[in-house]
């Protein structure tokens, strides 16, 4: 039995046991995370560390920088920064602060200098992200769990561990999605990825 499948079976048995003990919310959350992790190309440790990086980064942003709209997305220890800041200096300072987190390998700083976007623009970005992901699912050429989509001001950022073919397919689908003005690839390419 494949290690991932064995993990899923053991996890589901544990979750059922918790359900029988009345711990439904905890079990439901755990089941969702386990299903995502089984199809993820990152190791469980890296998956968890990506979550930790995002929490640490948010903490640093709240502590040091006020009134900024910064999104922090970590995938395989590579961090993407999107949003708006009031100055080029603050953009650099935020990038440096995130780079100093111990486990971060690389920071792609796509922060733009200017005023914060309006709520309607952010809602539109969420809608675009949903449309891109829906097109990924309908296309079926790769798992939606292999490509993370972040949209900011109409720009779709694509992250993941992918083969060249998967990256090209994801880029083309995102590029031709209504509302997307630009696509930025933040992929890690691995031919071995197609075997997982």
Regions found by a protein language model. Name each.
Residues 10-22:
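Bacterial N-terminal signal peptides
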């Amino acid at each position: 039995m494949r290690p991932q499948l064995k993990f899923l079976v053991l996890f589901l048995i544990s979750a059922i046991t918790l359900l029988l003990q009345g711990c439904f919310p905890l079990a439901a959350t755990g089941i969702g995370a386990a299903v995502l992790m089984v199809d993820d190309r990152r190791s469980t440790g890296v998956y968890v560390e990506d979550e930790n990086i995002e929490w640490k980064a948010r903490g640093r942003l709240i502590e040091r920088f006020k009134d900024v709209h910064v999104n922090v997305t970590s995938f395989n220890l590579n961090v993407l920064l999107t949003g708006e800041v009031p100055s080029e200096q603050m953009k650099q300072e935020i990038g440096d602060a995130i780079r100093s987190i111990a486990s971060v390998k690389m920071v792609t700083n796509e922060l733009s200098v200017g005023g914060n976007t309006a709520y309607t623009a952010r809602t539109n970005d969420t809608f675009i992200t949903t449309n891109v992901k829906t097109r990924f699912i309908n296309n079926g050429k790769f798992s939606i769990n292999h490509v993370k989509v972040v949209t900011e001001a109409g720009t779709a950022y694509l992250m993941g561990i992918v083969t060249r073919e998967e990256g090209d397919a994801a880029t083309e689908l995102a590029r031709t999605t209504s509302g997307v003005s630009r696509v930025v690839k933040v992929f890690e390419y691995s031919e071995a990825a197609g075997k997982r």
